[in-house]
A protein has these predicted regions:
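Nucleotide-activated sugar donor-binding and catalytic core shared by glycosyltransferases
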Residues: 1-204
Length: 204
């Protein structure tokens, strides 16, 4: 419900807020990649691989810092290697309203954030989940799970940039609802009769 009700921001205003040029004629990705506790020693290499593929394909990308889990320093170190790439925008954190609106206008979310599982289906946004984080979680069909592999990453990014494939995957069914749960809850509560039976406890 919060996602649905989040105030919309124009691309022009978003550009000003993050100090990075965005326009409707140019596709951009949002990248958020966290460390997996069981693979924290690989975090640098995994993040470097993701960003290097995006760089080689010259994908305009907004990169957001990871959480503070073990291995986060490796991810941040990898991000710092790309600080001078002109079509990359690196942010340590973003207010929720700006983050949601970046997703609303993005071509794809790439990395392994839970936002790729929960938020993107409602927004009709393709999500590329790289590696084992989030693996086996219940998810909508807009999410593509791939290993941290250069060839597969490049192939999948290319698929997302194909308009025909993009339209096919972006509007898949959303298993998490349409953002109107509060109205449904109110409707159910209104249908419940308030009487003594409701307040009587039964010990089974």
């Amino acid at each position: 419900d919060r996602l649905r009700n989040e105030k919309k921001i124009t691309l022009n205003d978003l550009s000003k807020k993050i100090q990075f040029n965005l326009n409707k004629n140019e596709k951009y990705f949002v990248c958020i990649q966290h460390s997996l506790s069981s693979e924290f020693k690989k975090s640098y290499d995994q993040m470097y691989l993701t960003l290097n593929c995006l760089k080689k394909m010259k994908i305009k990308t907004i990169i957001i810092y990871p959480n503070s889990d073990a291995g986060s320093s490796g991810i941040i170190s990898a991000i710092s290697r790309f600080k001078n790439v002109k079509y990359f925008c690196i942010k340590k954190n973003l207010p929720r309203n700006i983050f949601v609106n970046l997703l609303r206008n993005a071509r794809c979310l790439i990395g392994n954030s839970s936002a790729g599982i929960l938020e993107t289906p409602f927004l009709g946004l393709p999500s590329i989940n790289v590696g084992n984080r989030q693996l086996k979680r219940n998810h909508a069909n807009n999410t593509i799970f791939i290993p941290s592999d250069k060839k597969i990453l490049i192939k999948t990014i290319s698929m997302i940039n194909n308009d025909r494939f993009y339209k096919k995957i972006a509007k898949k069914s959303n298993i998490f609802g349409l953002g109107n749960s509060s109205n449904k809850i109110i409707k159910v509560l209104k249908s419940i009769k308030i009487n003594k039976k409701l307040f009587n406890k039964e010990i089974i």
